[in-house]
C-alpha cells in the first residue's frame, strides 16, 4: 500500500497539527499500514512549544499535493566519466537498457549527455582517419577496445597527432604513405614494422597475435613509437579502433535540459512534450545528477491518497 498522508487545514494551529499526528498514529496501529502526519503550513510558536514539551517531531511540511518529479519513479543509472570509451558506453547502455547516459564529473555535476543517436552520428558522419587524434584518445582506451597489450609506450599517454593508416602495401610504397605520428595498423612483416619506425610513426598496432621481436621493441622505444599488440586481424582492428574515442568528444554539451525534484509533473510534461528527447536527467537541490526519467515514467506516476 502506498503511504496515506494525514493533513489538516492551511496555516495550522495546535489542534490541526496534533489531530493529524494522533489520527495518523491511530490508523497505523489499527491497520498496520503507513499513515504519515503532514502539515499545510509553518508551525507557530505555541505548537512548537507543545511538540517540544512532549518530544514529538513536527509533521512533514507539504506545500502542495500537486505531483512533483520527486514522486516519479525514475531510473537510478549512475553517470559515466567523460574519458570512458564509446565502446564501454555502448555496452553500458545495452546492459542497463537505456538510450541516454549522463556524463558527470567526480562530484556528479553534469558535463554532457550521450545518446545512441550521438554514437550513430559519429560513426556515420564524423569518424575519419583523424578522429582518434582529434579526440586525444588515451592509449588505455585503445588497448581496451583492441583487447591487446601495450608492448612499448605509456598507457597514460594520449594519441594526439596523426592519422590511422593501414599498412597494406610493400615497404617502398609505405614510405610515401605513412606520415609522422601516424597510427599504423599492420601484421607480422618485419620490413613493414621497421618502415613505420623509420617514418616516425606515433604508434604501431600489430595484429593477429604476432609476437613483437626484441629488435623492433628496442627501436620503437628509442624512437618514441608506441606498440600495441592485439589478437585481432586487420579488418577487425579497423572496425573497432574508432570505438576508443572518449565520450567527451561525442557527447552533447550545450542546451541540456535538466529538471529538479520539486518541479511539478504538469510543468515538466508541458516542457518535454515539445521535445523529441527520450530521457532527461534529474538533478538534486545541489545540482548533482541523481538519475534519468522518461515521458513514460511521468505517465506511470503513482498517486498517494490523502
Regions found by a protein language model. Give the residues of each.
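A glycine-centered beta-loop-beta connector
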Residues: 72, 93, 101-119, 272, ...
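Conserved small/polar residues in nucleotide/adenosyl-binding loops
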Residues: 302-306
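N-terminal beta-loop-helix "entrance" segment that forms/cooperates
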Residues: 36-56
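Feature captures the catalytic cores and cofactor-binding loops of soluble hydro-lyases/lyases
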Residues: 46, 66-67, 166-251
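The conserved cystathionine-beta-synthase
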Residues: 80-98, 104, 194, 258-277, ...
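Short, ordered loop/turn segments at secondary-structure junctions
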Residues: 10, 40-42, 63, 106, ...
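Non-catalytic interface/targeting segments
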Residues: 109-183, 251-279, 288
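A glycine-rich helix N-cap at a beta->alpha junction
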Residues: 50-71
Amino acid at each position: 500500500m502506498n503511504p496515506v498522508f494525514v493533513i489538516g487545514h492551511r496555516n495550522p494551529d495546535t489542534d490541526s497539527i496534533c489531530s493529524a499526528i494522533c489520527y495518523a498514529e491511530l490508523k497505523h496501529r489499527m491497520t498496520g499500514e503507513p499513515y504519515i502526519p503532514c502539515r499545510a503550513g509553518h508551525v507557530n510558536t505555541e505548537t512548537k512549544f507543545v511538540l517540544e514539551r512532549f518530544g514529538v517531531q513536527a509533521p512533514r511540511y507539504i506545500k502542495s499535493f500537486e505531483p512533483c518529479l520527486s514522486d516519479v519513479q525514475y531510473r537510478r543509472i549512475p553517470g559515466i566519466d567523460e574519458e570512458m570509451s564509446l565502446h564501454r558506453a555502448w555496452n553500458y547502455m545495452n546492459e542497463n537498457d537505456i538510450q541516454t547516459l549522463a556524463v558527470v564529473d567526480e562530484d556528479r555535476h553534469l558535463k554532457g549527455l550521450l545518446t545512441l543517436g550521438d554514437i550513430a552520428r559519429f560513426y556515420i558522419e564524423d569518424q575519419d582517419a583523424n578522429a582518434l587524434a582529434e579526440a586525444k584518445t588515451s592509449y588505455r582506451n585503445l588497448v581496451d577496445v583492441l583487447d591487446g597489450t601495450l608492448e612499448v609506450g605509456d598507457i597514460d599517454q594520449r594519441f594526439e597527432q596523426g592519422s590511422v593508416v593501414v599498412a597494406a602495401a610493400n615497404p617502398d610504397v609505405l614510405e610515401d604513405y605513412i606520415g609522422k605520428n601516424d597510427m599504423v595498423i599492420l601484421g607480422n612483416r618485419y620490413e613493414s614494422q621497421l618502415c613505420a619506425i623509420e617514418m616516425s610513426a606515433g604508434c604501431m598496432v600489430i595484429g593477429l597475435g604476432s609476437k613483437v621481436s626484441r629488435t623492433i621493441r628496442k627501436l620503437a622505444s628509442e624512437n618514441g613509437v608506441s606498440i600495441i599488440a592485439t589478437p585481432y586481424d586487420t579488418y577487425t582492428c579497423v572496425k573497432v579502433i574508432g570505438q576508443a574515442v572518449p565520450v567527451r568528444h561525442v557527447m552533447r554539451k550545450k542546451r541540456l535540459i535538466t529538471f529538479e525534484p520539486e518541479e511539478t509533473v504538469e510543468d515538466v510534461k508541458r516542457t518535454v512534450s515539445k521535445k523529441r528527447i527520450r530521457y532527461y536527467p534529474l538533478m538534486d537541490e545541489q545540482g548533482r545528477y541523481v538519475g534519468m526519467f522518461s515521458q513514460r515514467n511521468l505517465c506511470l506516476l503513482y498517486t498517494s491518497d490523502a
